Swiss-Prot record:
It comes from Arabidopsis thaliana (Mouse-ear cress). The keyword Zinc does not apply. Gene3D superfamilies: P-loop containing nucleotide triphosphate hydrolases. This is GPN-loop GTPase QQT2. Residues 347-372 have a biased composition (Acidic residues). Residues 303-322, 335-346 have a biased composition (Basic and acidic residues). Heterodimer with QQT1. Keywords: Acetylation, Coiled coil, Cytoplasm, Cytoskeleton, GTP-binding, Hydrolase, Nucleotide-binding, Nucleus. Disruption phenotype: Embryonic lethality due to embryo development arrest at the octant stage.
């Protein structure tokens, strides 16, 4: 059954291969779209631990943009969410049926969400072009992500989606923290380490949104971030191994704390929204000054490496041709049916010049139902 259409049965291996190919293609198109870069809208990707209040927070952002007469666009990337308190302009659930994916691929809930996101990522260039068409009328694009944070932050599709956004618009990641639950220094440290890893993985500006401030003030967190001695004093009474580790990490994270923006918000009461949008605007400016330049540099590096690789391959091919002195070179890697290969070479002898690369060669062999891997260079 095609999970994108929920129709007839198909081969799972074939589907997976197609998926990998599409992801590769998308990676290339994301990398090459820098020429279309737009300064507006700002993409706000909302991530956070399960239950931290991402969806409620996004709902609050939608209400705030509406009230302040700015134009928002909402993208939902959580295929497993039952109902959303806001209307999403683009919803993964309209394209991928999460339960069908679970059934077809015989997966559990997390595998189902991950595969749904992978399938959706293969179409993400279309999502970006829809937003590009409306770019002039939009101020913000608000992106909700799956409840299980790692499904988005540590998956290939999450990286592809983030990269596709970041190469076309200024993009800011918002990490939602459950403030009441982070009042324990060890939980706080786990959250900060996660936020830090997201910052280094995405290489995008990050805003820490301490949510649920209607229940617990986030002042303690700001104090811990500003002065590691206050944090160490809070953890002093705990002699466990985790506490000692958190203690030493507080020093290491000092640089991270200095470079990110933190705001206290409440998705329920709406407190802190102005401060949050100020942090987003400042981060978007920072994106243009620092992150965009870095992104362009990384892209140029990637292109240079690809160019070098091509040159190296051509040089290798030229040397092979020279050493064969006009004859036929057969690169044999585990040949089983020698006669069949010789026959194949003779049949194709008419060609003036023909080079089969490794991929083509593999295809041909697959088609003929042979498992030999043979490369021929005809001169
Ligand atoms: N008091 C209070 N509760 C909140 C706030 N934000 C969210 N909640 C509650 O926290 C719970 C989880 O909120 P969600 O918005 O579903 O959190 P989520 O991160 O989207 O959850 P998953 O996507 O399922 O992981 C709900 O019961 C919300 O009502 C807040 O600012 N204050």
């Amino acid at each position: 059954m095609d999970p994108m259409e929920s129709s007839s049965e198909q081969d799972i291996v074939e589907e997976s291969q197609k998926l990998v190919d599409s992801l590769d293609k998308l990676r290339v198109s994301a990398a090459s779209s820098s020429s279309n870069f737009k300064k507006k809208p700002i993409i706000i990707i909302v991530v956070g631990m399960a239950g931290s209040g991402k969806t409620s927070f996004l709902h609050r952002l939608v209400c705030h943009t509406f009230d302040s007469k700015s134009h928002g666009y909402v993208v939902n990337l959580d295929p497993a969410v039952m109902s959303l308190p806001f209307g999403a302009n683009i919803d993964i659930r309209d394209t991928v049926k999460y339960k069908e994916v679970m059934k077809q691929y015989n997966l559990g809930p997390n595998g189902g969400i991950l595969t749904s996101l992978n399938l959706f990522a293969t179409k993400f260039d279309e999502v970006v072009s829809v937003i590009e068409k409306r770019a002039d009328q939009l101020d913000y694009v608000l992106v909700d992500t799956p409840g299980q944070i790692e499904i988005f932050t540590w998956s290939a599709s999450g990286a592809i989606i983030t990269e596709a956004f970041a190469s076309t618009f200024p993009t800011v990641v918002t990490y939602v923290v459950d403030t009441p639950r982070s009042s324990s220094p060890i939980t706080f440290m786990s959250n900060m380490l996660y936020a830090c890893s997201i910052l280094y993985k995405t290489r995008l500006p990050l805003v820490l949104a301490f949510n649920k401030t209607d229940v617990a003030d986030h002042k303690f967190a700001l104090e811990w971030m500003e002065d590691f001695e206050v944090f160490q004093a809070a953890i002093q009474s705990d002699n466990s191994y985790t506490a000692t580790l958190a203690n030493s990490l507080s020093l290491s994270l000092y640089e991270f704390y200095r470079n990110i923006r933190s705001v206290g918000v409440s998705a329920i009461s709406g407190a802190g929204m102005d401060g949050f949008f100020k942090a987003i605007e400042a981060s978007a400016e920072e994106y243009m000054e620092t992150y965009k330049a870095d992104l362009d540099m990384r892209k140029a590096d990637k292109e240079r490496l690809e160019e070098e690789r091509k040159k190296h391959e051509m040089e290798k091919l030229r040397k092979d041709m020279e050493s064969s002195q006009g004859g036929t070179v057969v690169l044999n890697t585990g040949l089983k049916d020698r006669d069949a290969t010789e026959k194949m070479m003779l049949e194709e002898d008419d060609e003036d010049f023909q080079v089969e690369d490794e991929e083509d060669s593999d295809d041909a062999i697959d088609e003929d139902d042979e498992d030999d891997e043979t490369k021929h260079y005809y001169l």
